[in-house]
Curated annotation (Swiss-Prot):
One of its GO terms (biological process) is riboflavin biosynthetic process. Catalyzes the conversion of GTP to 2,5-diamino-6-ribosylamino-4(3H)-pyrimidinone 5'-phosphate (DARP), formate and pyrophosphate. Disulfide bonds: none annotated. Pathway: Cofactor biosynthesis; riboflavin biosynthesis; 5-amino-6-(D-ribitylamino)uracil from GTP: step 1/4. It comes from Neisseria meningitidis serogroup B (strain ATCC BAA-335 / MC58). Its EC number is 3.5.4.25. This is GTP cyclohydrolase-2. The active site is at 127 (proton acceptor), 129 (nucleophile). Signal peptide: none annotated. The gene is ribA.
Length: 197
């Protein structure tokens, strides 16, 4: 495969939204990532895709501090509706700072800091994720052209820089509530996320 990731195994994964094929990938350092796929990608047509970074609090514990869980659910539903697509699930918790540091950052947010201020106060990067990992997964699956479910322009640019043709950006505005309103505004104001179209 690529030097970034190796494909390890695949299996059938029935979910609330339909059946996916789950592919497991591993980095040389042992970090694991998965991709959920539906359909065949051999025709070369653009593939509906979501690059989703792990969020234990939002994806599994249903936290209302973020929009991650609703975004993952909406992406899974969209891929099943399309009948063809991929969700790349990168194990980069807390924008790459890890779960314990995310809990520390959440504590500072509880004291009034926003998500960016909290990371910086802890001496951590604002965003330490590496979206190039997705390109390795696309390469393994033969995907060269995508329709990307995202509000994050950095994901688009990273894929383009890696030679992936992003033919369309599909906004993913779901999950806003009173608890995460400031967080979403900070993503727009300080991280450049496209939140208003």
């Amino acid at each position: 495969m690529s030097e970034m990731l190796n494909h390890v195994a695949s299996c059938r994964l029935p979910t609330e939204w339909g059946v996916f094929t789950m592919h497991g990938f591993e980095e040389a350092n042992g970090q694991e990532h998965v991709a959920l796929t539906v359909g065949n990608f051999s025709d070369g047509n653009p593939v509906l895709t979501r690059i989703h970074s792990e969020c234990l609090t939002g994806d599994a514990l249903f936290s209302r501090k973020c929009d991650c869980g609703p975004q993952l659910e909406a992406a899974m539903r969209a891929v099943q509706t399309e009948g063809r697509g991929i969700i790349v699930y990168l194990r980069q918790e807390g924008r790459g700072i890890g779960l314990i540091n995310k809990i520390r950052a959440y504590h500072l947010q509880d004291q009034g800091m926003d998500t960016v201020e909290a990371n910086l106060a802890l001496g951590l990067p604002v965003d330490a994720r590496d979206f190039r990992l997705a390109q390795s997964i696309y390469e393994y699956l033969g995907i060269r052209s995508v329709k990307l479910l995202t509000n994050n322009p950095e994901k688009i640019q990273t894929l383009k820089d890696a030679g992936i043709n992003v033919v369309e950006r599909i906004p993913l505005h779901v999950g806003e509530n009173l608890e995460n309103k400031r967080y979403l505004q900070t993503k727009a104001d300080k991280l450049g996320h496209l939140m208003s179209e």
